[in-house]
Amino acid sequence: LILYALIFVLAFCSIVYELLLGQTLSAFFGNTVLRYSVTIGLYMASMGLGALYLQWRRARSSVLRLQVVEILLTVCGGGSVVGIFLLDGAGLPTLPLSIWAHFLIIVIGVLTGMEIPLLIEIRNRDRRSSETSVLGVDYIGAFAGTLVFAFYFYPTFGLVPSAFLVSLLNAVVGMLLLTQRGKLGSGERGRFHTLLAGQALLLAVLALLLWRADAISEMCLSLYLGSS
């Protein structure tokens, strides 16, 4: 049950990251339909690349590899929106800014594509042929993410606080991978605990950023208006 809850939340976080990027691109470059279409298209294609990459390069431990993926997703997702505003405020031309934003979409998509096979592998250690249940929970989590983003996160918090909030949630899930440490080999636990400490540090930083999210949002808005 705990693993299914983690699957749900991870899918929720990943789709919200992409929607945040789609909305940010719309704010900077206009043409909302185009931005969202390209964002979702790149996301789906990148998920496929992530799954294929994982097939080519199997890790010794799926739990260990998943912890690395969650750390990267937390960093990329949490910093994506603010990073775009900062680069724009620094005077980065439109084309490089657009390339960077779409690169983030691809990176988050690849990492998300790696999540699903790793989660299936972890689940299969307890019960065979559980792919359908993992995929089902993953899809429902993504659907929930689209609804919560559209009807609550974005209208209530805006872009920057939403990014911090979702990445904080992602970091919490990364910490909860501690519940799966029994599936680690004896030689892998040291590295896992090191990664867990890094995840805890990220969690603390994100909590601080969320606390100061309103001030950071105002700074981003000033940068945006100043460059317009």
Task: Set out the residue ranges of the language-model regions.
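Alpha-helical transmembrane segments of multi-pass membrane proteins
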Residues: 1-228
